[in-house]
Design a protein with these regions (language model features):
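DNA replication initiation on ssDNA origins
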Residues: 1-70, 79-84
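Short secondary-structure junctions
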Residues: 16-20, 94-98, 135-138
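Broad hydrophobic/π-residue packing in well-ordered secondary structure
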Residues: 17, 106-112
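DNA replication initiation modules
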Residues: 55-86, 91-93, 112-145
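Short, conserved phosphate-binding/catalytic loop or strand-edge motifs used
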Residues: 98-107
């Protein structure tokens, strides 16, 4: 199984649309570019392009059942101390996965083995964001139904 196949399996979300981001300016901390919603399923090929840095891919976490298998906290802080935040994440009793975002902040992912209601995912991530000191951060999924 390729890395793209693994990401395809891990990020299970809305299967009829996805986000795409084409970077056009890398001269600043936050890369400039064009984002758009594509009204078509995401594919392993799109994951390959994403992992190769050709085009950003955004999977909508909430599915048509108002459930999800993953969610994220979007911490948009330009002078973020990544090492300090990772240390905090390791102290929490929930397995979270941090990833640097294109803005220089961090996306903190929570994955589940089974589908959970989007409202429950949002509530859990909001609680974690507050515990981390980032209660005002954007939470995905954005909606609970």
């Amino acid at each position: 199984m390729t890395l793209a196949d693994q990401f395809f399996e891990l990020f299970k979300g809305l299967d009829r649309a996805h986000g795409a981001f084409k970077v056009t300016d890398t001269s600043k901390v936050k890369h400039g570019g064009r984002a758009q919603t594509m009204k078509e399923p995401y594919t392993v090929r799109l994951w390959e392009d994403h992992l190769e840095g050709k085009q950003g891919l955004g999977v909508v976490p909430i599915n048509d059942n108002n459930g999800c298998f993953f969610g994220a906290i979007d911490i948009d802080e330009y002078n973020l101390d990544h090492a300090k935040l990772v240390k905090k994440l390791n102290e929490i009793d929930v397995k979270l996965f941090p990833c640097r975002s294109k803005s220089g902040g961090m996306h903190v992912y929570l994955f589940t083995r089974e589908e959970v209601p989007a409202a429950a995912m949002r509530a859990k991530l909001q609680m974690i964001a507050v515990e981390l000191g980032f209660g005002g951060s954007e939470i995905f999924p954005k909606q609970s139904q």
